[in-house]
Amino acid sequence: MKTFLVTAFILLFITLFVISESYPCTFFYAATKKSVLFGNNKDWISTESYVWFCPPEKGGYGRILFGFEFFPGQKEPSSGVNDQGLVFDLGWTSNKERTGALTGETFKGNIFDKILEECSSVDQVLELLKKYNNLQVQYTYLVIMFGDKHGNSLIVDRGQVRAKTTRFQIVPDDSKAAEPCTQYQIAHSLLSSADEISIDLFKRILASTHVEASRATTAYSTICDLKNGKLYIYYFHNFMEEVVLDINEELTKGYRTLELGSLFPPSVAEKDFRWLKNRELEEKKEKSLAKTKSREAFEHISGTFVNSFDPEDSVVIGFENDKLYITSADKSKVELYPESLTKFFIPLANGDWNLTFAKGESKNSSTLVAEHEFLGMKMRYERIK
């Protein structure tokens, strides 16, 4: 699983996100002659979010990325901004049918990181998307927004591109829905009635559209001042605590990854939410362990499997002290928990991986299908030994 995540995103993330139709992420862009701002609420099932800083190198642009860890040691961006004033964010859509024509080749890697590294404007993003078909092949269940400091933005939804036609754009884009969702209604009302756009206005919109629920919460929020290169960060829907970063200044400090919560004072609400989610994980494990059979019953899944899409991506499944583990090509290792003789899961804070094994002609399982419970990621692995 060198790319349990990268390959997954080759069929997918991150991000980020619609947990269900009840909790869509909210992000929006607005531009006037004076200001160009972007804001987002990242609604998710976990607060274990990260920010990583990638300084410019080899002619590429520097960028700051936000995201989650969907497999131990493997983080994927769900939003980000570069030092040229280009920003992106993504969310889930319930309609996964592709409507755009399929063109171009598939880029093996994270297309969003590549866009921020190579593009400085929405026009350049469009040119790159003509070359690569990732958004049409892998991301049909994502709605993605790109915006630049020049006043241009667009939404890519199931392969279709919608450019900004007024001074702002909003996701979820429910402008044609019979009953627009609450987040859209609030954001649209505040943006359309404002004489000027400002950081205070965007903060007000984020505060009014954030989510607090046992299932999902607003893990983090950001406002990007694209003309002035400033980044405003809020953690766990607390808009009283604000971290302001100068994008160019931060990128001079070198490459680094931080847990987003480390930038903020401790929060009782966040601690309680994290405790609740950890308890849910432990309960899942306990239920699974109650089904555990003898080691011999699971011997048929031991072995090495290679990804059908990417031969460099392989996983090894084996026993240690009578416990089953799956190890990726980069040596990340996690325990497998049984649901039956052929179905297993990996309980993680950012969503479980469900693994299904199928037997071939021999007594051993010949194929493995790994699927993320929320993200729609599905990968097929074939046994090689």
Go through each PLM region and give its residues.
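Peripheral terminal and inter-domain segments
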Residues: E280-K385
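Bacterial N-terminal signal peptides that target proteins for export
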Residues: M1-F9
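A generic alpha-helix structural signal
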Residues: L126-L129, K203-L206, S302
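Short, low-complexity Ser/Thr-rich regulatory SLiMs
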Residues: F28-A31, C224-L226, F319, F357-E361
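C-terminal, well-structured catalytic/ligand-binding subdomain of enzymes
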Residues: Y23, A30-K75, S79-E117, T140-L142, ...
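Secretory/export targeting leaders with adjacent low-complexity proregions
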Residues: Q124-T140
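Bacterial N-terminal signal peptides
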Residues: A8-V18
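Extracytoplasmic/secreted envelope proteins and their assembly/folding machinery
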Residues: G109-L116, V122, L126, S302
